[in-house]
């Protein structure tokens, strides 16, 4: 045990290691209907009903019906606990980690946890035992004791979450499993970090917010793009006023994934492709939305209030299948409804506009757009370029490299970080583990996770209703009006 860590507050109402917690899991319909296997994911029949009662019934109705359904879910239910905004972690000398999911992403991310001092990987879990054993060998190769392995069945992750020697659970599994796994981790007294998106239904987002507040456990969307070098530089410049009063921004996940989604070996089964048979909207808003929301202090002085979405005809995946997949391939049984490109306009309480795009099924170069504009100028990424008054007055883009002095301290401290995605993965894991060790407030919280993910179900509804604006819930229940720190941290004393 960590002898210098204060005992973690137990979840209110439901002791984390009691039979009551198990009973809650057994009663959760999402836990019953979704199996953590390729066959379970494919056969679970997660169509529109997976979005919740409001979404399923409104999907094919009129715009007024869609608005009514969204408003019903947007209304904040009574608070069950206390806000988690600004709540620090408990200080500890060592962060003990359990990892659920060791496919492509999990297998690479475990290396980053093992590279950090003061971090121990205590348990690993995957339904494919070979993957769990491979991860366990990495742990011992790093000089740590052999971790416990959980690979018995699709429910074995529950036993990992029940362990008394884990502080933080990292969830790296198919999207439909993120919600039940995050929920189980918090019910068992663990802080939890989840890959994108954190859930697929508005009702699930509210449940995670409420459970985080009630259990006093942090539930975070581990959004690595918030830690990109350019993103963190723009953040500091924006908060220093170089862009003037912020007016607009844009973010995207435009990434041609057709080959990977039809590759039988890259993903563990067709789970990612199958979401294009279920939803029409933006399936992956977080990479683009998170950084722009940070620039604008969303949940920390401003909030997003509505979203309006449109989408193109779904042609890309079917065309790729026609050209590349043999007759008899299981994919020929699939009917794709997901728009090749979705475009959403998000309005904030202060009148700012955020444009979100999503396109993984047509040919194009990679781009997250990552733009920000204000009364003094604008930045756009892919390629990076900037135009700021009074320096720029000739209507020509300027070199963003000139602004290196505004790099975040994390990038000055770790100039050439290891790991994937240009080093942002390492920066994210380093900072999260630092916050947990030193007892700091996390850079983002459950409210950010919920806001960044809300476009998943809402964009689908809006597209079905011909682009009608829909309300985005205030997951903070009014706490957004209070100015507080976020990603723009200063280097802490160790």
Swiss-Prot record:
InterPro entries: Gfo/Idh/MocA-like_OxRdtase_N, Gfo/Idh/MocA_oxidrdct_glycsds, Glyco_hydro_109_C, NAD(P)-bd_dom_sf, TAT_signal. Its cofactor is NAD(+). Transmembrane segments: none annotated. The keyword RNA-binding does not apply. Pfam families: GFO_IDH_MocA, Glyco_hydro_109_C. Its EC number is 3.2.1.-. Substrate binds at residues 253, 272, 284-287, 366. Predicted to be exported by the Tat system. The position of the signal peptide cleavage has not been experimentally proven. Coiled coil: none annotated. GO terms for molecular function: hydrolase activity, acting on glycosyl bonds; nucleotide binding. Keywords: Glycosidase, Hydrolase, NAD, Signal. It is an enzyme of class 3 (hydrolase). Residues 1-58 form the signal peptide. Binds 1 NAD(+) per subunit. The NAD(+) cannot dissociate. Residues 1-32 are annotated as: Disordered. NAD(+) binds at residues 104-105, 126, 175-178, 195-196, 224, 284. Belongs to the Gfo/Idh/MocA family. Glycosyl hydrolase 109 subfamily. Glycosidase. This is Glycosyl hydrolase family 109 protein. It comes from Streptomyces filamentosus (Streptomyces roseosporus).
